[in-house]
Amino acid sequence: MKTLRLNFRSAILKALGALLLLQGCLAHAQVQELDRVVAVVNDDIVLYSELQDRASRIKDKLRQQKTPLPPEAVLHEKVLDQLVLESIQMQMADRGGIRVSDSQLNQTMQNIAKQNGMTLDQFQQALSEEGVTYQSAREQIRREMIISRVQQRSVDSRVRVTEKEVNDFLKSASAKEQRAEEYHLAHILIALPENPSDAQRKEAESKVEKIRSQLDQGVDFKQLAITYSDASTATQGGDLGWRKPDQVPSLFADVAPKLAPGQTSEPIRNSSGVHFVAMLEKRGGVSKVVEQSKVRHILVQQNELRDEIAAKKLIEEIYGKVQAGEDFAELAKAYSDDAVSAAAGGSLDWVNPGDMVPEFDQMMRETPVGAVSKPFQSTFGWHILQVQDRREADIGDRLMASQARQVLHRRKYEEELQNWLSEIRDEAFVQLKL
């Protein structure tokens, strides 16, 4: 009830502000339309001046894009619906303790300026030239960040991407084309007749051993092909050119894709003789070697009972316990708000660069193996993390699967977001007065 009274009081003050504005206008004998309430949304209101301001900005943007303007009534209806939904979500954020700190907002403003190739001062000047104050732009960005967090917290948990969906996506024609590799191969053949004598076998094996020995010494494969190979490509250094997977001779089909550039196969024997195949180069495909970190963390989030200050205080207390020698895994099980990792003692297993939100990713990179980070804040709340180990790994296949999962998640998220917005709109008390 206290929250309701405070919010209702805020709504009254908002309306009083509009009334004072009207009195000022009348004092200057200006004929203007009375600012009024155009929507009641639970215990908040939307004013006509807010509607006009948002509609004006949208019209300016449409003009810049040379897009025909819709009828005024249609535009106002759409904008009012947008403001109603924003009001509902901001009220949800207030109840859920979702905030954006000044430090996070400042960093976001810096990032926006950087993305536009400007310093922060230049960005402020550009806004001023467009008739927008930096403070109003800053608060609008804060509002958008808060709404985004409300949506993520509410909608993400409703989105599920199954392994079958990922696998089906990876089997699609577009995904296969993206994954296709090409191999630049070279080949040596030590030929044997159909029914070789013991002497012929012995001579062939002698050549094989010479080739193996010289390869171990670093002799160039092409030079060895010219010297020893009985294949028609010998004079070209055994070069088979670039081959797609389905163009690789069946004898090498299982071996060649597993070779790294510069690597030569073990001898391959068949009825025509003994073969060596070398991977000169690879191109295409999704091979990517990265440094992975084995990480565990503890997350403390804001909620109805814990505001940002309390969340920060709790993570600092947990950090103190870790520094005092208490077991990280047990503390994660007892305190972490990340239910999945908490059950595993905070373990996130092996994490690739870029898998996590930027704040987490940066702290993970900066924390030495075995060390525990100081408390830091991300969009999800307050964390501490420990880097348990690091390794290099080729994540090509996993990267493709991860990208497929992200594509599918985005598609489902957009669909589920619209469903969720409809639900919260239906569940809210909304009275339109336009």
From Swiss-Prot:
Domain PpiC stretches: 180-281, 290-389
Localization, UniProt: Periplasm
Broad class of where this protein is predominantly found: periplasm
A cellular-component GO term for this protein: outer membrane-bounded periplasmic space
Reactions catalysed: [protein]-peptidylproline (omega=180) = [protein]-peptidylproline (omega=0)
S-adenosyl-L-methionine found in the keyword field: no
Single GO MF descriptor: peptide binding
UniProt EC number: 5.2.1.8
Gene3D superfamilies named among the record's database cross-references: 3.10.50.40, Porin chaperone SurA, peptide-binding domain
Swiss-Prot/TrEMBL GO biological process terms: Gram-negative-bacterium-type cell outer membrane assembly; protein folding; protein stabilization
Disulphide-bridged cysteine pairs: none
Superkingdom of source: Bacteria
Secretion signal span: 1-29
Domain comment (free text): The PPIase activity resides only in the second parvulin domain. The N-terminal region and the C-terminal tail are necessary and sufficient for the chaperone activity of SurA. The PPIase activity is dispensable for SurA to function as a chaperone. The N-terminal region and the C-terminal tail are also required for porin recognition.
Protein name as catalogued: Chaperone SurA
Source organism phylogeny: Bacteria, Pseudomonadati, Pseudomonadota, Gammaproteobacteria, Oceanospirillales
Gene field: surA
